[in-house]
Structures are given as C-alpha cells and as structure tokens.
C-alpha cells in the first residue's frame, strides 16, 4: 500500500568494535551484511570504538536522513559508546551481534555473543530502549534477515511517534466498552484531538458545492462499478470525504500522521444524509483509519496494523457464532477447525473493497433502517459497503488502555474462510485455532471491547515485538490446548 500517512523507514547501519579486538572483524562483517541485505540501507563507514566515534557516526547517519538504525557488534563491542548511539539517535535502534565461523578461532574470534550481554545490561542501566531480536547473534545472512524483520517494527514505532488521533463526538450510549482513557495514548507518544459532531457537521456544510466533488464522485463510480452504488448518494459522500481529508490536513499540527475515530450513529445519518461507512473504507484503503463508534483504541490498533503489514486493515465486531448448519455444510471436513474455532466478524460496511469479494455493493444499514426509517425505503441509511470479506490470512489484534489505565493487548493469527456468510453487512467467517478458549479466557476474562482490528496477513511476530518494545506487559494470544490459561478450569 502506498500512503503518505505511513512512515518510510530509512535504515542505517553502524558497526562497533572494542579496541582490544581487531577492528577489521567488525568492518568486514558489516560489509558482508551489506552484501546479503536486499533492501536499502546506509552503510556508515565510521566504526565506533569510543565516544567521539559515536558522535561522528550518529552525525553521519542523521545527515543521510536515516530514521532507524542497526547497531552491529562485529566483536565484543564498546558497551558505553554503542549504547550511547541509542541515546543520541532520535529513532528506533536495533542491536545485533556477529556469530563466529567466518575466520579462525584465534584472531578471528570476536566474542560478540558475550558483548551482547554487556550491551543489554548498559541499555537497562541507562533506561534506553533498544530493539533486540529473538536470537540476536547471527551470520551475515541471518543478520540481514533480522534487519528485514526490523523494518516493520521500526515503521510502527516511527508512525506512533508522529500520530494524532482525531475524534468526533462521544461514544454512543451503551457502547462504553470502547472506553478510551487518553493516559495510555500519551504514554505511547500519541496525540489526540477531541471534537464535537457539530464541529464535523459545520465543516461538512462548508464543503457544499466544493469544486472537487465531481472528481471524487467519478472515482467512486470507477471503484465500485455500474450497478454497485447509488449515483444520487455519491455527492453527499464525496463532500464528506473531502471534509475529513481537509480536516486532517488542517489539524495535524506538529504531527505527520492522522487517524480518525468518529461517531456514526444514531444522529449522524439523519443529519448528514447518509451512512459514513463507504467513505471510511475509502480512507483506510489509503492508509487513514476511520474507526467506527469513536473507538479511539480501535483507530490506534488499525494504524499499528497498517504500519506492521504495510497494507490496509479493517475494524470489526467479534460478532456472532457460526450456525451449526453452515459449519456442517461448508467447513467440517474441508478445513481443520472445530465449530468453536470459528466466528463471524462484522461491521456495517467499513472494510476496504479491495479486501472483499467481487459481489460487494454499496447498500443500506439494515438495523438503522429499522430504527430510523421504520423499515421503509432507505434514504439516509444508505452508504454501507456490504458483502463477504474475501478469503485471506489474517491477524486479529488490539491494543487497549483498560479502565485502570493500563495498556494491554492481544494477538491471534488465523484466516477468513472461503465460505459464504449468507448474511448482511461487511462480514466474513473467521477461523482461529482455539478461538473458543481465547474468547473466554482472554477477550471475556480480561474485559476487552467487542471491536478487534484485522490485518490481512500473518503479522503476529511483528506485533508481538512492537508491543514488547512499547513496554506492554500483558500480550495475550490464542494459547494451544496444551497450555491452559490461568483461569481455565482443568476439570472442564
């Protein structure tokens, strides 16, 4: 996904060397990594042995525009200068070390395995953050793989550092589950701007007859195709899209990136003249999350997932169980899942059309039509993007600040099955191993909201590393049956 709302990672690598070891060990091993790594990376030629070297190297990578850094211990490394790199460089830093085997065991032994221990100890003493991979010691080929894995982690960290979440309206009544203590946002370095629905309505009216509306309408028609949208509704929706985009640009302030969390019912459709879901889907497909029902941490989670996957995402209700007859007809014997491993993820119509089956259409919100239009011919309840979500690998996840002000998270990898839902909305049949147990002992037990963010690939590894880096102490996942949850009854 190409988006100017997601940071571009510009990597640099600095090799470090302890002065009682041959400096050539670090420099040559660094060059070997450069040859193996397939992406773009600035190869800093200053090898750090002391604090003056450190200042020189950091100045060089900054001058080259690097915003993320690899510190490579080609030998034992100088623990003070190498950790001060993280202090003096304003961006995420990964620390990795060289494995032995590319030389003899006399002059060719670097002891970086040992040096990594001193490095981590010094980072801790200085209260500095450094990203250290699961096993940080490797050959040139292995370190190159670690660097590739670091890129999405760095992208998330840089994104959060520059993010502002913009909200419109309070949470709807009886939707307190989407609570949003802002303390957690500030702990993550994220800014928030909270506005009234009236502010949005005023801005929307000011965009009436905007000369750009026709162009947006044409783009909507091209995206959806003939017979898959309401031509008479397009101008209203285009006007709203321009309103949000202009608001984002005018209200970024000191920040580079934005996400929205907007109130979308009950007053919105009757006052704006449509449901905002399709417009929301268009923005998230371009890298700007618009979370439903003022779900601030849903918007935050969506943004994290976009940076982690470098792709668009969605936000869904963990909505309903799969009927036994659908399981028996279309899942049992075809997929290796129990009925309780499956559920339906649903929202009114905010999932990007590029992640939906080809039969998707702009329709009307059935539930709101019952409530607001008495089930009559739909008018202002139109605007939802409906259809089955296309089969895909997925990661279901969320980062949430709970009612006590503590940041917690969960991650579960799975898939959207190629099985018709036979239902309405933007909806799909999801399958996650041991979902039933995860549902009870994580989602229910720990009081998570009913909204979950969805990335359309397996990015659990990246998200886990990101949450660790951010200092999230509780990172839950769908544990296998062989690993019971603390609250799981052993006599069940």
Task: Give, region by region, the residue ranges found by the protein language model.
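Short, well-structured alpha-helical segments in soluble
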Residues: 54-66, 83-85, 243-253
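C-terminal catalytic subdomain
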Residues: 284-421
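Extended hydrophobic packing segments that form well-structured cores
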Residues: 365-492
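N-terminal basic/disordered segments at the start of proteins
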Residues: 2-37
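Long, internal scaffold/assembly segments composed of regular secondary structure
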Residues: 217, 222-308
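Cap/lid and interdomain-hinge subdomains that line or gate substrate/regulatory clefts
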Residues: 4, 9-11, 40-42, 102-229, ...
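Short, acidic/small-residue loops that bind anionic groups at enzyme active sites
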Residues: 84-111, 118-124, 129, 282-294
């Amino acid at each position: 996904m190409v988006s100017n709302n997601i940071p571009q990672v510009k990597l640099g690598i600095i090799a470090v060397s302890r002065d009682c070891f041959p400096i050539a060990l670090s420099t040559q091993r660094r060059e070997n990594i450069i040859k193996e790594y397939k992406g773009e990376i600035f190869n800093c030629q200053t090898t750090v042995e002391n604090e003056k070297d450190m200042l020189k190297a950091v100045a060089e990578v900054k001058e080259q525009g690097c915003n993320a850094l690899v510190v490579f211990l080609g030998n034992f490394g100088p623990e003070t200068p190498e950790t001060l790199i993280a202090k003096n460089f304003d961006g995420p830093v990964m620390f990795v070390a060289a494995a032995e085997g590319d030389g003899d065991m006399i002059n060719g032994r670097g002891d970086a395995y040992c040096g990594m221990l001193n490095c981590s100890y010094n980072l801790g003493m200085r209260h500095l953050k450094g990203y250290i991979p699961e096993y940080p010691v490797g050959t040139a080929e292995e370190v190159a793989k670690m660097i590739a894995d670091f890129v999405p982690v760095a992208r998330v960290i840089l994104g959060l550092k520059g993010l502002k979440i913009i909200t419109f309206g309070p949470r709807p009544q009886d939707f307190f589950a989407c609570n949003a203590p802002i303390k957690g946002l500030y702990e993550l370095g994220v800014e928030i701007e909270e506005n009234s629905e009236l502010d949005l309505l005023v801005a929307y009216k000011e965009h009436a007859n905007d000369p750009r509306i026709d162009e947006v309408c044409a783009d909507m028609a091209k995206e959806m195709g003939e017979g898959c949208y309401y031509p008479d509704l397009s101008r209203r929706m285009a006007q709203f899209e321009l309103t949000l985009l202009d608001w984002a640009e005018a209200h970024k302030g000191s920040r580079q990136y934005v996400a929205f969390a907007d109130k979308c019912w009950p007053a919105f459709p009757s006052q704006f003249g449509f449901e905002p879901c399709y417009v929301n889907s268009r923005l998230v497909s371009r890298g700007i999350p618009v979370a439903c029902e003022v779900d601030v941490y849903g918007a935050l989670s969506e943004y994290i997932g976009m940076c982690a996957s470098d792709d668009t995402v969605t936000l869904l209700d963990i909505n309903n169980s799969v009927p036994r007859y659908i399981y028996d007809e279309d899942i049992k014997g075809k997929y290796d899942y129990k009925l309780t491993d499956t559920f339906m993820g649903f929202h009114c119509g905010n999932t990007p059309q590029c992640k939906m089956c080809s039969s998707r259409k702009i329709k009307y919100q059935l539930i709101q039509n019952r409530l607001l239009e008495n089930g009559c011919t739909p008018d202002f309840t139109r605007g939802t993007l409906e259809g089955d979500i296309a089969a895909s690998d997925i990661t279901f996840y969320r980062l949430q600040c709970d009612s006590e002000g503590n940041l917690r998270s969960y991650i579960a990898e799975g898939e959207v099955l190629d099985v018709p839902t036979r239902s309405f909305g933007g909806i799909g049949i999801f399958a996650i191993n041991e979902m039933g147990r995860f549902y009870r002992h994580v989602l229910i037990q720990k009081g998570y909201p009913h909204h979950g963010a969805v990335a359309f690939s397996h990015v659990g590894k990246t998200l886990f590393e990101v949450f660790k880096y951010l200092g999230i102490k509780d990172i839950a996942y769908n544990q296998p049956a062989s690993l019971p949850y603390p609250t799981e009854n052993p006599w069940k």
